[in-house]
């Protein structure tokens, strides 16, 4: 298993990815409400932001996998 410092990094990366995921879900719900209210331009902007969150979430999840597989390690603080 990865060292404790790397395990914490992995947990932190997964937590950040989860926060982005749920923030993206919230943005998509807000975009749907805006669209229903006839504010299509604003809805499209929120959807673009939500899509960018998804891309970053995927990268963070990938980094967490690399930490888990010990391809990325965290050095102990000095």
Where are these regions (language model features)?
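N-terminal acidic leader/helix
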Residues: 1-32
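Short, charged, intrinsically disordered terminal tails
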Residues: 1-10, 58-78
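Short, charge-rich amphipathic interface segments used for partner binding and complex assembly
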Residues: 29-70
């Amino acid at each position: 298993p990865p060292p404790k410092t790397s395990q914490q990094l992995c947990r932190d990366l997964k937590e950040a990815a989860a926060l982005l995921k749920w923030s993206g879900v919230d943005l998509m719900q807000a975009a749907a409400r805006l669209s229903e209210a006839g504010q299509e331009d604003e809805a499209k902007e929120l959807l673009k932001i939500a899509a960018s969150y998804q891309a970053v979430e995927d990268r963070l999840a990938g980094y967490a996998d690399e930490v888990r597989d010990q391809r990325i390690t965290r050095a102990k603080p000095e």
